[in-house]
Design a protein with these regions (language model features):
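HEAT/HEAT-like alpha-solenoid repeats
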Residues: 11-29, 33, 66-74, 105-112, ...
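Hydrophobic residues within the alpha-helices of tandem HEAT/HEAT-like
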Residues: 1, 17, 47-51, 86-94, ...
Length: 213
């Protein structure tokens, strides 16, 4: 589809989403104080498809995505559903760097949610995007490490995978200490892989010291 046609298809979707975000919009399909969250989710998914391979569409929807990210109530489950779709859209299109950081920060906030499913999908998504913007994910390292102590084994597993990915020359010593603490209480199924990763981290740390003058 030509860029001009994609942009034309985008405009009415953006306008509708703006209306849904407006407090003056008719609340006929209100759910927990949020206007028609199901339609908002569908529009975000459609925008994701349109903007995935189009710089023009991505530029056209950056502003509305920022509005959704900042104005949606995260204290409600329906709000979190909208925010998650917004995050996925931001991360899949050619979004501004600042908008990507905003999306990753939303995922970081999800890690503190009491809902296991929300924490899990946040970790899963962070694992997928850490290679895109490692620095933005690193800012949430403390919260990610807290997830190593989560009661849910699937959350601990995802947090551990993400922790491995975050290890670099500047934090290898601190993260190795965290992994050693986790090893003491880790489930049996984690120990072999965890020990291997600790050995790799230790080797990296020794190489850093060897290279130092």
């Amino acid at each position: 589809m030509r860029a001009s046609l994609l942009t034309q298809a985008t405009s009415p979707l953006v306008a509708t989403l703006k209306n849904l975000l407006s407090t003056s919009f008719s609340p006929e399909h209100d759910v927990a104080g949020i206007t028609d969250p199901f339609l908002q989710v569908k529009i975000l998914r459609f925008l994701r498809v349109l903007g995935r391979d189009s710089i023009e569409v991505s530029e056209a929807i950056n502003d509305i995505l920022a509005q959704v990210a900042t104005n949606t109530d995260a204290s409600k489950n329906v709000g979190n559903s909208i925010l998650y779709e917004c995050v996925l859209t931001i991360l899949e299109i050619q979004a501004d760097a600042g908008l990507r950081v905003m999306a990753i920060n939303i995922l970081g906030k999800f890690l503190g949610n009491r809902d296991n499913n929300i924490r899990y999908v946040a970790l899963n998504t962070l694992n997928k995007v850490v290679s895109i913007d490692t620095n933005a994910v690193q800012r949430h390292r403390a919260t990610i490490l807290e997830c190593l102590r989560d009661a849910d084994i699937s959350i601990r597993r995802r947090a551990l995978e993400l922790t491995y990915t975050l290890i670099n020359e500047s934090n290898v010593q601190a993260l190795m200490a965290e992994l050693l603490q986790f090893l003491e209480v880790a489930d049996v199924e984690f120990r072999l892989g965890l020990t291997t990763q600790i050995c790799i981290a230790a080797e990296r740390l020794s190489l850093i010291h060897i290279s130092e003058p």
